[in-house]
UniProtKB/Swiss-Prot annotation, chain A:
It catalyses: pretRNA = a 3'-half-tRNA molecule with a 5'-OH end + a 5'-half-tRNA molecule with a 2',3'-cyclic phosphate end + an intron with a 2',3'-cyclic phosphate and a 5'-hydroxyl terminus. This is tRNA-splicing endonuclease subunit Sen2-1. The keyword Ribonucleoprotein does not apply. It comes from Arabidopsis thaliana (Mouse-ear cress). It is found in: Nucleus. The keyword Thylakoid does not apply.
From Swiss-Prot, chain B:
It is found in: Nucleus. Residues 225-250 are annotated as: Disordered. GO terms for cellular component: nucleus. It catalyses: pretRNA = a 3'-half-tRNA molecule with a 5'-OH end + a 5'-half-tRNA molecule with a 2',3'-cyclic phosphate end + an intron with a 2',3'-cyclic phosphate and a 5'-hydroxyl terminus. InterPro entries: tRNA_endonuc-like_dom_sf (IPR011856), tRNA_intron_Endo_cat-like_sf (IPR036167), tRNA_intron_Endonuc_cat-like (IPR006677), tRNA_intron_Endonuc_N (IPR006678), tRNA_splic (IPR006676). SUPFAM superfamilies: tRNA-intron endonuclease catalytic domain-like (SSF53032). This is tRNA-splicing endonuclease subunit Sen2-2.
Length: 237, 250
């Protein structure tokens, strides 16, 4: 399925301003001001300056929390977003109960204890983000994430992503669930992308972000096979 | 959600010809001719006369199999449909490899051996059919059944039905619930889950008596929308998310 740009010229605008470039800008800006995030049980609140808030929006990290403060903006980040900025881009600091978490292991353990499948979801999130996909919550489509080729103001999301892991996967076990997901994603013009995160059982590293290195991600798209569109003479290529 | 009739006058037609009446007619007609269905590994083929084929279609049992025969019509029934006609309506016989299965327990055991979840599905199917809902496969909506108030030519289906038991694989995580609710909503149906309570694993499953002991719990799941649930509009403001309520209309 080709990307569906939202307006004429959106594709040219996207090509002129690649997401990777905006992310680099954001990174240097956040590092400079030593932006600080506050960890709660389900998200991270990040306090930034207004130009940084604009940059975060352009890269699609978090959501702006409406506040009356003029010089400071509050951004609500999901665990995956916050850990990506903290661990991968190394451009924000995070504190819990007023104490800054210097060590990434502490943060990893806190987030894992708040959210059981955090390790798997984070691996999938960073896998896609590293390829410069923009990743948003897939709540309204009954999936884990939706991914965009560029900023959501320019293009519709192309993939609805389900994250699966060995032993922990509660989705797509029965046909009715597969039919349901494929029909729903098809009806909103997305492809269903299933990311299988394989983890090696290694008890030593299990509690450390280092275990991410051992995880592998397998990508699969699932769609309906339509006999009319799959005639032999048309699919020779 | 109110029933969506397909054309003006469809509701009047439905009221004039209740499904229960057509089913009684069908029951009489099939019993008279002693119709017999042939069991295969996934369905039952029933040979009937043209008038009976028409009656089966009016009651929405099975699908017509195209053939060149003029006097006989072949109808393909699902296990649930065939067993309902055989056991509840007692109007067809079932045969396997040319041998008539006199005992309904034999048929039950055969169907159960081919499809382990047959007892649960049959309980759900007969539960809704007994209330004169017309049931069809929910394959295209990722559910087990869709339920119609009357014949599908008159009305759109109102409920998409998921059949659940204690160890079912659906609706265990939020993303699945969101998916099923959104899909059902987008095709103007309400998601209905039928929880069949009973022991499916024990020896009892071999006995038809267990059908009597199974109970069915009905729940509809719909999205809770704050705008549509303002206090002045609905006095029961203490609804859960998603809105789960007992289904009184069934």
């Amino acid at each position: 399925m080709a990307p569906r740009w939202k307006w004429k010229g959106a594709e040219a605008k996207a090509l002129a301003e690649p997401v990777s470039k905006t992310v680099s800008e954001l990174r240097s800006s956040l590092t400079q001001t030593e932006a600080l995030g506050f960890l709660s049980s389900c998200n991270v609140l990040l306090s930034v300056e207004s130009e940084e808030a604009e940059l975060l929006d352009r890269c699609c990290f978090g959501r702006l929390v409406v506040g009356a403060e003029k010089d400071k903006r509050w951004i609500q980040l999901s665990f995956e977003e916050a850990f990506f900025l903290f661990y991968k881009l190394k451009c924000i600091k995070i504190c819990l109960h007023g104490r800054s978490l210097e060590n990434e292991v502490d943060l990893w353990r806190s987030m894992s204890s708040f959210k059981q499948d955090f390790a798997i979801l984070y691996k999938a999130y960073s896998h896609l983000r590293s390829k410069n996909w923009i990743v948003r919550s897939g709540l309204q489509y009954g999936v884990d994430f939706v991914v965009y080729r560029h900023h959501p103001s320019l293009v519709h999301s192309e993939y609805a992503v389900l994250v699966q892991s060995i032993g922990g996967n509660d989705r797509l076990k029965v046909w009715s669930d597969i039919h349901c997901s494929v029909r729903l994603t098809g009806s909103v013009a997305k492809s269903l992308l299933v990311l299988y995160v394989n983890r090696k059982v290694n008890t030593e590293k299990m509690n450390l972000p280092l275990c991410l290195e051992d995880y592998t991600v397998e990508e699969q798209t699932i769609r309906r096979w339509s006999p009319e569109l799959s005639r032999e003479d048309e699919t020779r290529t | 959600m109110a029933p969506r009739w397909k054309w003006k006058g469809a509701e009047a037609k439905a009221l004039a010809e209740p499904i229960s009446k057509s089913v009684s007619e069908l029951q009489l007609s099939l019993a008279e001719t002693e119709s017999s269905g042939t069991l295969s590994s996934c369905n039952v083929l029933l040979a009937v006369e043209p008038e009976q084929a028409e009656l089966l279609d009016r009651c929405c049992f099975g699908r017509l199999v195209l053939s060149a025969e003029k006097i006989k019509k072949w109808i393909q029934l699902s296990f649930e449909e065939a067993f309902f006609l055989h056991y509840n309506l007692k109007c067809i016989k079932i045969s396997l490899q040319g041998r008539c299965l006199e005992n309904e327990v034999d048929t039950w055991l055969y169907m159960k051996s081919k499809r382990p979840n047959f007892p649960m599905f049959f309980k759900a199917y007969s539960h809704l059919r007994s209330k004169n809902w017309v049931l069809r496969s929910g394959l295209q909506y990722g559910v087990d059944f869709v339920a119609y108030r009357h014949h599908p030519s008159l009305v759109h289906s109102e409920y998409s039905v998921l059949v659940q038991s204690g160890d079912s694989d659906r609706l265990r995580v939020w993303s699945d619930i969101h998916c099923a609710v959104r899909l059902s909503g987008s095709v103007a149906k309400t998601l209905l889950t039928l929880y069949v309570n009973g022991n499916f694993k024990g020896e009892d499953v071999n006995l038809l008596v267990c059908l009597e002991n199974f109970t069915v719990e009905e729940q509809t799941i719909s999205r809770w929308s704050p705008e549509l649930s303002r206090e002045d509009q609905s006095t029961n403001s203490k609804q859960h998310v998603p809105n789960v309520s007992n289904l009184n209309t069934l």
